[in-house]
Amino acid sequence: MKKNRLLFRVIILLILCGAVGFTLYQGFFADKEKMQIGKEAPNFVVTDLEGKKIELKDLKGKGVFLNFWGTWCKPCEKEMPYMNELYPKYKEKGVEIIALDADETEIAVKNFVKQYDLKFPVAIDKGTKIIGTYSVGPLPTSFLIDKDGKVVEKIIGEQTKEQLEGYLQKITP
């Protein structure tokens, strides 16, 4: 009876060690697609609220301002009008602004877009897979991607209009 108990405990211990080892492996080594400053931005494909497919690799040759946000996020709400105001000017210069919502309902996101009359592409990161790939923590978080598809900078937190314009100038081709 004691041998069975000991064997059972050893088996449970091995299973736990295996689970911990697998978790550590996944966290540190498995995902080579993670975003790194100075490296090529991980590709993604989303469909915006207008039904248009957006694939990051198709935007090579343009600067990309990639913004992760949420409708509930007050700092996100404050910077959206600045992005909307600057979008036409920088779109003409070869810069795209893409806003990826953090997995909220389509109704909530559409209502927000309508309320602020947003003109730039807005999509929902369903399942937050892209957020994970880009190692996004607090919202808003934005990434500057140059014309060659490389990540130039990661910006965490709300931006003023002046800061945003400076970032857009930085990635203008």
From Swiss-Prot:
**Membrane topology listed for this record:** Single-pass type II membrane protein
Q: In which pathway does it act?
A: Protein modification; cytochrome c assembly
Q: What keywords sit in the KW lines?
A: Cell membrane, Cytochrome c-type biogenesis, Disulfide bond, Membrane, Oxidoreductase, Redox-active center, Signal-anchor, Transmembrane, Transmembrane helix
Question: Which SUPFAM superfamilies does the entry link to?
Answer: Thioredoxin-like
Function text = Thiol-disulfide oxidoreductase which is required in disulfide reduction during c-type cytochrome synthesis. May accept reducing equivalents from CcdA, leading to breakage of disulfide bonds in apocytochrome c; following this reduction heme can be covalently attached.
Keyword Transcription regulation present in the record's keywords: the answer is no
Alphabetized InterPro entries for the sequence: AhpC/TSA, Thiol-dS_OxRdtase_ResA, Thioredoxin-like_sf, Thioredoxin_domain, Thioredoxin_ResA/DsbE_sf
Q: Alphabetically, which GO biological process terms does the record hold?
A: cytochrome complex assembly
Official protein name in the record: Thiol-disulfide oxidoreductase ResA
**CDD domains tied to this protein:** TlpA_like_family (cd02966)
Q: Which domain of life is it from?
A: Bacteria
